[in-house]
Amino acid sequence: MGFGSVRGLSKFTPDEIAEMGFDILWTAFEGTESNFSKLKGRSLSELYSSLKSRGVALLSSMIIGFPYQDRAKIMEEFRMITDLGPSLWQVLIYFAFPGTPLHVKMIEENRYLAEFRENPDYRTYDGFSMHFSHPHFTAAELKELQRELYQKNFEILGPSLLRVVRVWFEGYRNLKNSSNALLSSRAERMKEYVRSAIPAIYPAMILGPNRARRADAKKLLHEIIQETGEISLKERLFGLATIPLAGWTWLTSRLNILQQPKLLRIEHPATPAYQPEKKLADLKSISPSTIPQSGSTCPICSCAVGAEKE
């Protein structure tokens, strides 16, 4: 997995990026008016389609909570990123971490929320909380909208794992007859990825978020069989075994048990800094009686100490 901005990826052809060996690339969508220079380059639709056709799955990130965004604007940008069809997707809330220029600006404009300004909980600086006032949302409303977008994305595009497998499968089909040795070997690697992921398709055919997504999973499995051969007994058994495991994961998620592990904090005492001046002072303070005399034995190396000859 690698990271590439739109500006950076636009400097290479899709084949060149595929030849580099990337299976997944994380690239930012952020927002249509975020004005980040890293977003300048080829059109997103062209970039996404060309990379996916080479078997490069894309992880896209979107930010909500920019000052220009109201609910209508966020939903418009959400539809845009959904139409791009990223294999993996994240949406984070715009936040101002202490020490950043945005944090300074929010403090100066008196927009930082009191509970974070007076006693900040740094565990919330993770993209899932808003720390300053917004012209269109309260902190609670934006957090609820974030959850809504994650659910909508799942319902529209389906499980991320299957979306990744679909891209790898298309990469295999498009590159398997390439005269480029790097790309044809890439196709074989994509084929291995796809075959190894067959068991993961079974739960999606039964537990997918809706009928359309379950049909997508069945279609993908059918196409893989047609293109790469029948499913072995081992693959079938593994696939059937994943169904109850997926059911257990769904149940624990619904009940909110056995989810994120609790924070384990371990503190180690700081190592004292080396102080050469103190060491020198200690040496100078040694009593002359501890210095070995001529004819005695050195207590450090056990060698004889002789008198200097003039």
For each feature predicted by the language model, list its residue ranges.
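A generic "structured core" feature
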Residues: 78-81, 89
